[in-house]
């Protein structure tokens, strides 16, 4: 399963972002998925 926009994710070990999203830890300690565009 993948997670979508603004959902919590992990760069190294799931949950991972769905296609079209990337994981950012800019909001450390919470990493979230953001749209690639």
Curated annotation (Swiss-Prot):
Keywords: Amidation, Disulfide bond, Ion channel impairing toxin, Knottin, Neurotoxin, Presynaptic neurotoxin, Secreted, Toxin, Voltage-gated sodium channel impairing toxin. InterPro entries: Beta/delta-agatoxin_fam. It holds the Pfam family Toxin_7. GO terms for molecular function: sodium channel regulator activity; toxin activity. Disulfide bonds join 2-18, 9-23, 17-33, 25-31. The keyword Disulfide bond applies. It is found in: Secreted. It comes from the Eukaryota. The keyword Secreted applies. One of its GO terms (cellular component) is host cell presynaptic membrane. The modification Asparagine amide is found at residue 37. Expressed by the venom gland. Insecticidal neurotoxin that induces an irreversible spastic paralysis when injected into insects. Modifies presynaptic voltage-gated sodium channels (Nav), causing them to open at the normal resting potential of the nerve. This leads to spontaneous release of neurotransmitter and repetitive action potentials in motor neurons. The presence of a 'disulfide through disulfide knot' structurally defines this protein as a knottin. Belongs to the neurotoxin 07 (Beta/delta-agtx) family. 03 (aga-4) subfamily. Aga sub-subfamily. This is Mu-agatoxin-Aa1e. It comes from Agelenopsis aperta.
């Amino acid at each position: 399963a993948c997670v979508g926009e603004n959902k919590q994710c992990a760069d190294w070990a799931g949950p991972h972002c769905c296609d079209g999203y990337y994981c950012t830890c800019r909001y450390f300690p919470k990493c979230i998925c953001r749209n690639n565009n």
